[in-house]
């Protein structure tokens, strides 16, 4: 499967923010929301990617990594290349959340960063769903479907 090159502006740059709470609480919230938004029943990444997370116990600082892998349907492990990473660590009196796009394509990558930032701040968000919902309408327009059918009426 060929993928187009990522722009230098979006690949492997880490977006960082400091938030309140504990690493364990921030990890639990980010993981819950990512699984619901990105991998839920109609999540845009459900068929193409695999969610993997590793978290230390709160007694050991609670640091955590969430890594999204490209889905590999080979005979063993379904985790292919790493595509997106969120790291969560204690920093000073807060929690450092680092968000790195490794292989996701735009505009999905930018929307995923927006989602993760919002979740780390305790906000509701699922911007990636708007892109996933817009795709069938755009495809219907390209195929010449009537406007009412494309709008889902």
Residue ranges of model-derived segments:
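Ser/Thr-rich, low-complexity intrinsically disordered terminal regions
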Residues: 2-153
